Amino acid sequence: MANSKKQAWFFYTTGLPSDIEIEVDDITFHLHKFPLMSKSKKLHQLITEQEQSKVYSHIKLENFPGGSEIFEMVIKISYGFKVDISVSTAVPLRCAAEYLEMTEEYSPENLISKTEKFLSEFVFTNVQESIKALKACESVSSLAESLCITEQCIDSIVFQASSTDPSSFYGWPINNGGIFTVDRKKQSKDSKTELWFEDLTELSFPIFRRVILSMKSSVLSPEIVERSLLTYAKKHIPGISRSSSASSSSSSSSTTIASENQQRELLETITSDLPLTATTTRSLFGLLRAAIILNASENCRKFLEKKIGSNLEKATLDDLLIPSYSYLNETLYDIDLVERLLRRFLENVAVSSSSLTVVGRLIDGVLGEIASDANLKPEQFYNLAVLLPVQARVYDDGLYRAVDIYFKTHSWILEEEKEKICSVMDCRKLTVEGCTHAAQNERLPLRAVVQVLFLEQLQLRQVITGTLLTEEDGDKTVVDLGRWKEAVKENQVLRLDMDTMRTRVNQLEKECLYLKKVIAKIDKESLLKAKHGAGKWSIGKKFGCKFSAQVCDSQEATMVDRRSRRFLS
């Protein structure tokens, strides 16, 4: 039955029956008075009081530190048996010795002095052992606090952590969730103490935060504080990792997962405790994803967005592709978040040109990934593309690729919307390959194609002119042979492109002339029918066809003029 009491019998001297019963946690220990009274002042007083009142010797110890297991160890020590003290039992044994008043004054080499010696020699000299002892303090928190054991453990952790080299963190791999993981194969014997970051995750959050606050108040490097926080967050907030590995899933199965409210509170507290510097961008993205999933406070999300935005050049394309967790967003990825992060980055007046270029390539990569989203509206694509300053893009090939994918996926958008999106591109920044592709791209609006063709012709003339120019020093002309060969090769490529362009324009002219003849014929037939009362308006006017001979004629003249000028040159 649940109420029945278990009994533990201890007869360490043959033939001597027990003369006292002590109850701890519903377990009755049948013991002997003499060894207990010789070591414990409190038990001596309790046994003496019962003997004077002539009551059967049965003592119940309420709220005994460490419970029946620790009391059993105390009994063995009192009887003179050898007991191996470990880090996990040293703290509750010290508290139990205080509870039973097993002082040095009462009996030499008593339990208090033994446990204090063990703590000072084997626990407070090692950071990992101090963390284990601090974990043991949680079960005897009140006595551990009054004896200052908890404070001593925290001070020991902070002191020992100060000897850890923060630069060793940067060589460690990072998993998909954005949190550091330990590469144990690469660790040397001298770096084994760095595993204490994982040990910190076993602490309860109130105790862990006391450690963090103590770290921040000391001269400890921000990298160590950051790593401690992020490792703890990964262990207790599953949403930080984008994909769980086998190791993380196995470890999470043994860890009790907190409720959503507890995770949210934990995340907000960890975020507020992050150092102002030295936080890795990828780790922050993991926290930001968790903040969105857990619907953390606005201040928490703004803080993370500000920290990420200030170091956006350190992010990767995978970091920025955060799924839309809100049902209000129709797009696959959170485009508004990317736009806010970019604005945060541009607010920094100290942005270098190299960082701006890196972010430019990053945003063009994002545009290329989101362009295939059927729910992405033209204004959303345009707003993100136009937000980058002109100097952020050295070449516009990445932007052109994104625009081409968007037009291919969204063939239904209006011509005006296409022209607006193409206005972000600078055709002068397209490479030769980009210009060649754009000149033959039927998805681009006509205005964009004309701009590309015009710039191709301009570039061709500039290359030819620049190649033929030589330095005139009065004596002789010096021509760089290597540069000449390169220019000739590029000239040949451009000539082929011009031939392709000319063929396409000729086809367009033929189609225009053919359509003009067909429409003229239809209008002529309509006029004849109108005279006989068959209709009043011509089909050309009815359908709004406004093809004029002047348009095609002017284009023909222009092309003839271009050809003549080219052959003359």
UniProtKB/Swiss-Prot annotation:
The lineage of its organism: Eukaryota, Viridiplantae, Streptophyta, Embryophyta, Tracheophyta. Pathway: Protein modification; protein ubiquitination. Residues 194-459 form the NPH3 domain. GO terms for biological process: protein ubiquitination. PROSITE patterns: BTB, NPH3. Keywords: Phosphoprotein, Ubl conjugation pathway. Residues 240-259 have a biased composition (Low complexity). The modification Phosphotyrosine is found at residue 400. The keyword Oxidoreductase does not apply. Coiled coil: none annotated. Pfam families: BTB, NPH3. The BTB/POZ domain mediates the interaction with some component of ubiquitin ligase complexes. Residues 18-87 form the BTB domain. Signal peptide: none annotated. Residues 240-261 are annotated as: Disordered. This is BTB/POZ domain-containing protein At3g50840. May act as a substrate-specific adapter of an E3 ubiquitin-protein ligase complex (CUL3-RBX1-BTB) which mediates the ubiquitination and subsequent proteasomal degradation of target proteins. Belongs to the NPH3 family.
